[in-house]
Amino acid sequence: ALALKAYGTSIADDLASDKEAYNGEKMVAIYQKMKDMIDAGYWGDGILSTDFNTERNMLEAGKAAFTVDGTWNCGNFQNDSDTTLFDAQKIGVTRIPYIDEANKTVEMGGGSDTYYITTLNKSDEEIAATVKFIKYLTSVDSINEMCKSSPTTYAEKVTIDTGNYLLDDVNAIMAENTESKLEIPTYDSNTAAMDTIRNSLQALATGASAQEVGD
């Protein structure tokens, strides 16, 4: 997300085409920003061993100012066994801060519940039935029903009152988005890129320099 906020969505395509490199100047600058935040203690202690539940517990106990996560958390906060903070509307949502103001309304993300249909070794009847089923799953009526139990963002806009103020705020933010991309390695033809990059970034928390991580 930081790279998108610094350079816009073109950075994903440039990395995928090798016009830019993961150990190049632009990306090393992003790793350095991450390292600076780690060294300043923004992410707390033991970040490599801090899991989702620990993060949530710290937030709800007032030991963390914020948590960075996806829009599915709108539903999680509403459906959890302890909804005290949600009920009191003491949780808010905001954009990830931009690095270059030109990319203020650029975000990382994509549609939920995407589907594809394979025709491999399938009859015309099976393919037609699958198309009909997918059309039902992606219809506004179906998505409205899904949103009642799992309030989050979908590929179609819901037409019901979700009863979830966090989701309402998220939708208001997303309505202002100008561009978005999935996680950058998604666009790389190297299928191992995602794991390689995630694993390399962890070294920032163990003392590696930004350039070492890039290399």
Regions found by a protein language model. Give the residues of each.
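A ligand-binding cleft/hinge motif common to bilobed small-molecule-binding domains
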Residues: 71-87
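Short helix-initiation/N-cap motifs at beta->coil->alpha
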Residues: 46-60
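Extracytoplasmic/periplasmic substrate-recognition and gating elements
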Residues: 40, 82-149
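Glycine-centered hinge/linker elements that transmit conformational signals in sensory
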Residues: 17-48
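C-terminal capping/gating helix-and-loop segments adjacent to ligand/active sites or protein-protein/ligand interfaces
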Residues: 109, 149-155, 159-160, 170-215
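Beta->alpha turn/N-cap motifs
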Residues: 52, 69-74, 111-113
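Extracytoplasmic/periplasmic solute-binding protein
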Residues: 1-23, 35, 64
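Alpha-to-beta junction loops
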Residues: 61-70, 89
